Structure formats: C-alpha cells, structure tokens
Amino acid sequence: WSKSLAYRDDPRLAGFGFEHDSMVMPPREVGEAEQPPRLFIAALDALLGDLQASGMDTASIAAINTAGQQHGHVYLGEAARSAFASLRENAHQENLLTALKDCFAYGGAPIWKTANTTGEAEHIRKKTGGKAAIIERTGSDIPLRFAACVHRKLAGRYPQAYAATRHILQISSLIPAILVGDCTIPLDFGNACGTGIMNYRARQWDETVLQAVAADLPGGAVALAAKLPPLAHPLTACGTIAAYFQRRYGFSADCRIIVGSGDNPQSKVLASGDLLSLGTSFVYMISSPEAAIDPNGAANAMYDGLGRPFNFGCRTNGALAW
C-alpha cells in the first residue's frame, strides 16, 4: 500500500500560509525558509484517514517507522507536554489540530532551505575553535541549514519565542512523538548529525558546541541543552501508539512506534553501498566501514536509519534549480 497527499489541491491541507511554488511560508528576510508545523499535523490525520478508507487492516500493523525532512525542526512551548499526553489519555479528541493547537512556541518550522544564518554559522565555528575543530567534533563544517545555526538565529531575532521553548524536536521526531503522545521522546543519532550539535563519534550532544551555539543567550548552554531531546539508536522503540489513533483509525494498542530518522538517513537504508539521489537536493551517500570524517568539510559525516556510518555530499536545491 502506498499513499501520498496532493498538498496543492487537498482541502484538508489548505489555509496554513504555505506557498506552493516555493514550498515555504512567505519569507520575512532573504534566506529564511519555514513551513507551517500545523500543516504536518493536519497531514498526519489526513494520511491516516485515507489509509483507513482504503480498507487496510490497521489493527494488523505491528510497528511504524518514519522519515522526516532532515534539518527541519519545531519549537514546542509549555503546553506541549500535556497536549501530547492528552492523545494517550483521551481517545475522543476531535482531531490532532484541536488537540495540539497550543503546542508551538514559534509558528514556523525552519527547514533545509534555510540560508540566512551566515553570521550564526561563523560565530559557532569560531567559538568552537575554527573549521578543523568543529569538523572533528561534529563531522560537518556547520552548514547554514543545520539546526545549530537556526537555534541561534531564532534566539537572537525572536527571544520571546526562544525563552518560551521547552522542547525542540526535529521534524523526524515530531510525527512519532504525536503517535505515542509524548513530546519527550529521543532523537535518533542519525538525524542528530544534521543539527551540527552532536559529537559525531561519541553520539552525544557536544558540550563545546553547545557553549558556542548558546554563547550570550539567556541561560547559556544549560538552557539550550534542556530544550534538546536525549539521543538514541535509530531503531529504538519510543512507545506504543496513543489511544487517539487506536479509536479513530483502528490501530492495535500493541503497535510500536520507532523514533524514526531524517529523510537522507532513511534513504541510505536502501543501499549497503553508495547511493546517488537526484531529488530536491542532489546528494551522494558514500558508505564508510567506520565513523570517518572528511577533514576538508566537503562531505557531512552521518549515520543511516540502521545506525551505519556514511558520508554525505550535497548540492542543495539540485532538482529545484537545475
């Protein structure tokens, strides 16, 4: 069974301020690229509704794994924890949008097209000890689209939103968090590579990079670290599906939810060798027998959805521009 949503024409996905040609909300400055997180929530209900309408026996589904666009993330506020939990505790919610309407501390989800963080990237690189140092720690030379740059950008431009943020979730984590009704689930260490904050070899948040990202921000590195999720293997089960989805769509209470990963790490799962993807970005994924890092920073060191190391060369916006 396969199903996609025609987001341009589907009335269930209308009215979120999404520009179909650019695939982002109208930017407020050059290089800003954000999508409406409420669209992701509406799309999940729409997709599961279509799945149920197709006649699929949802009760027979034993586990769900997901992929989300790499680097994209959302900022959740104080109300998020109880709102997500309500999906477990109250099976009779009207819909996901209603249940989660007050969750977001910031109304946009910055995505991989972000290109307005040059100053933030240079700041983080310098504070970490320079190009060689940040590559050695994170496996990447802090590209503009990486979440570390965006967190600093948001904190400087929208300090109230940053202060109100309690949890930062990558888009790959948002969907499984909704499915289990828990916004404190782990982030897989594969997609954490695309944040620019994880120590690549240790597979933990890097304290030096945290200090660099949060330098001069309220609460410093301690406050930023508190907003980030714990890290886990990409195949970690983060719980069973929430009561809302059992009642509304017929899933079994035993259906397990996997923490998921980014779209690139999950694509790499398809090949044990190298993989060339000619999508919205042109990417070359090169298998590595160990956690190897390109000291020149031309490639990004990552892990795939099975936890295997690989290097990732990217021509951003490939098919959109060529």
Spans of features found by a protein language model:
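N-terminal basic/disordered segments at the start of proteins
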Residues: W1-R12
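Short active-site-proximal "capping" loops at secondary-structure junctions
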Residues: D9-D10, D21, Q69-H71
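Compositionally biased, intrinsically disordered/low-complexity regions enriched for serine, proline
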Residues: R8, M23-V24, L306
